[in-house]
Each structure stands twice: as C-alpha cells, then as structure tokens.
Amino acid sequence: MVPIGSGGGAVLRFLASMIDARAVVEIGTGTGVSGLWLLRGMRPDGVLTTVDTEAEHQRLAKQAFREAGIAPQRVRLIPGAALDVLPRLTDGHYDVVFADGDKTEYADYLAEALRLLKPGGIVAFDNALWHDRVADPAQRDAETVSIRELGKAVREHESLLPVLLPIGDGLLVAKKI
C-alpha cells in the first residue's frame, strides 16, 4: 500500500472544493492520507465515507483524522469489501467517489460510482497508469488489464466527461454529466 502523493492529493482536495462536496465515498482507506486531502476540500459539514477490508488500516486512518483535528462525525469508517459495502449506500447521494482499492475490481467500482454519484459528481481512480504498464500492450497481468479496460470504459461512457492526469501513478478523473 502506497499512499497518494502530494500532487494527487492536491487534485483530490481541489476537486472536492470545486464542487463544494458534502458527501464523498473513498474506496480503500489506507492510512487516511487521501481521506485527509478530500476532507480538506469538502464543505465544513461534509462527511467522508471510507471503506477498507483491513481493520488496521482503518485504525491508523482514524488516528490520523483525530490528530489532524477532523471531527469524528465527519468520517464514517466502514470495514468490509467495497463490493459488499457499496451496494448498501444511497443512490445519487454522493458528490465524489474516489477509488484506490483492488485494481481488478475497478470496473465494478465504476458501475457503483455511476449509481452513487449525483449529476455533476466526480469519480476518480488512482494508479490509472499502473507503473506505466497500461500503455504497454505486452503487459497482460490482471491488474494492468483491468485498469486498461477501465480507461476504455470511462472514455466510451456517454454520461462521463473524463481526463487522465499524469500525476503520480496516474489519476483518471471523470465528471458525471
């Protein structure tokens, strides 16, 4: 697990701020680094819902949020697999969905994000370049193929306006129109 870098984090903060985000879903809590960036861009009353399979990750993230002075009511930590948790979240309720979880599930995360997002909402995927493997057709491992297919699906989706940002390991961002 490698946390998002400062460039990617700054983009997440900017995106959350730009759309005055009140409700954000994060897939892959990690140690809370990307969650802190998102929270810093959200409205003061905004709530981050963050999902991770690892209890230790969520414990570390909770500690990071507390140390950063984030009010406990602004963060909802949900343990579990994203594809078990996301279907239980409210349709059309979220302003941003950020995915940095299991790369082989990115296409499924996209389907859930489209359901969860309000019109005008933003979906973002970290590691969209996957160590420069996505552009190399000879690379056929499961993660690379999944991320490559995600890029194609986002580009071709009629209700998404996408951009691939060459920040860190690539940040694929799309607005739901």
What are these regions (language model features)?
Residues M1-P3:
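Rossmann-like AdoMet
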